[in-house]
Amino acid sequence: MTENPGTTGNAGQNAQLALLAAKNERLADALRAAREQIVELRTQIDELAKPPGTYATFLAAHDDGTVDISSAGRKMHVGASPALDVDRLQPGQEVKLNEAMTVVEAGGFERLGELVTVKEVLDGDRVLVVGRADEERVVRLAGSVRDLPLRVGDSLTVDVRSGFVFEVVPKSEVEELVLEEVPDIRYEDIGGLGKQIEAIRDAVELPFAHPDLFREHGLRPPKGVLLYGPPGCGKTLIAKAVAASLAGMVDPHGTEGATSYFLNVKGPELLNKYVGETERHIRLIFARAREKASQGMPVVVFFDEMESLFRTRGTGLSSDVETTIVPQLLAEIDGVERLDNVIVIGASNREDMIDPAILRPGRLDVKIKIERPDAEGAQEIFGKYLTPDLPIHADDLAVHGGDLAATVASMIRSVVERMYAEDEENQFLEVTYASGDKEILYFKDFNSGAMIQNVVDRAKKTAIKDFLATGQRGIRVDHLLTACVDEFKENEDLPNTTNPDDWARISGKKGERIVFIRSIVQKKGEQGSPRTIEQVTSTGQYL
């Protein structure tokens, strides 16, 4: 059987046509790719050949579609692209210009700049700021900060060339030095200080609660209160309770959402090695207090460890920085500018070192001594920390028929009797006065609310350790008695008896001058003889 020559020829032609078609398709693809690459290269060449664009700061827009900008420190009036929504631009916003100096694109706000401090808020869009070397300038507020509540002392970033403020930096020197809060301490949380609390409430709360009566009697509220006494007896707690109580009195006077402010000034951190910085910080603190008080809110400015800042001038006990710090505080308290709704509370255990000009009437009018707690006050303080909701040991509960409240009350009485017993076990120091008289001081003479809290905490820790060792849960009276003894022993070496007179001032044992102190607590121990520490008559200069 033979093949048809015509059929064979057609098949060869078809194969050749298919091959040519494939070549044409590959060639078309190559040409298309080359064309696209040429277009892309041309685009890149065009981009590279473009003149440089310029960035400027938007100032204002006009009805005819033109805008005012600031470019490189020059104010210019230029056109804007029709595709750009000019009405949405904000003052201080960054914009992009083409080679014809036409605004073609909107950007954001500058995030960098020089750091300045607000000295005065002039109006809705301008502030007076202080920069380097105390240079003052008036700058405009950009749209990013125009609606923010600015206050004196705030740190801002500013572009000096355009004169715009772009950002409020969360770094205020005042906020570093004060704690602006409303404490949650109530008068009911403080034990053993009923008389002192009543005195400070009369001095602070009455003028705020009944201002009409004070005006009727021509009586001005006190400007300040000094709380003084030994350490750990509740001075700071009382100041916090005053602020919390004033906060609770605001709402009944019809100020919705209002509160009081407690500015807890960290005294030693105010001190600065640069001349005038401490005084500036004090001015900023009182400016913040006046700002809050101008809204009708009571403000408590609390200076803890007041003697660290406001020592008696001219004593030579320090570098004499107080010669300018003390007058600054005096000017703030009773200067030309009135200080309304602001109460200054100072706390100190060395009130003898505070400048007398601060303590005179008209400045710190009310002076309240916070005494060490007596036996009755100690029971009240124990009741704040040793409460019936704590786990009590079953053996102690069984003695009182399972009555939880009676058991806790009995435990408190037992530990207070042990703490305030005037027996040989509780003897602490023997002091000799300048007249030659001697007196035995007991541990009760150095008790404080802080020490009572520590005794209860020790007992709780011992109860936890006993539970882990024996499986018996709860606090026992033995835990409290042991904690009391351990607290006494731990405080044996703590009093600084090198200078008896200074020690007496800190410990609250004022009166006749003490010339000699002898520790007798070690008589109860097994090692050594009683420790005797004599007064150092001349300390000289120590390196």
Curated annotation (Swiss-Prot):
Stretches for region Docks into pockets in the proteasome alpha-ring: 542-543
One term under GO cellular component = proteasome complex
UniProt-listed Pfam families: AAA, Prot_ATP_ID_OB_C, Prot_ATP_ID_OB_N
Q: Which residues bind ATP?
A: 232-237
Named in its record, the pathway it takes part in is: Protein degradation; proteasomal Pup-dependent pathway
MF-aspect GO terms: ATP binding; ATP hydrolysis activity
Task: Read off the SMART domains from this record.
Answer: AAA (SM00382)
Q: Give start-end ranges for the coiled-coil region(s).
A: 13-50
User: Would I find Amino-acid biosynthesis among this entry's keywords?
Assistant: no
Similarity remark? Belongs to the AAA ATPase family.
Protein role: ATPase which is responsible for recognizing, binding, unfolding and translocation of pupylated proteins into the bacterial 20S proteasome core particle. May be essential for opening the gate of the 20S proteasome via an interaction with its C-terminus, thereby allowing substrate entry and access to the site of proteolysis. Thus, the C-termini of the proteasomal ATPase may function like a 'key in a lock' to induce gate opening and therefore regulate proteolysis.
State the oligomer form and interacting partners: Homohexamer. Assembles into a hexameric ring structure that caps the 20S proteasome core. Strongly interacts with the prokaryotic ubiquitin-like protein Pup through a hydrophobic interface; the interacting region of ARC lies in its N-terminal coiled-coil domain. There is one Pup binding site per ARC hexamer ring. Upon ATP-binding, the C-terminus of ARC interacts with the alpha-rings of the proteasome core, possibly by binding to the intersubunit pockets.
Q: What is this protein called?
A: Proteasome-associated ATPase
**What is the species listed in this Swiss-Prot or TrEMBL entry?**
Xylanimonas cellulosilytica (strain DSM 15894 / JCM 12276 / CECT 5975 / KCTC 9989 / LMG 20990 / NBRC 107835 / XIL07)
Q: What is the lineage of its organism?
A: Bacteria, Bacillati, Actinomycetota, Actinomycetes, Micrococcales
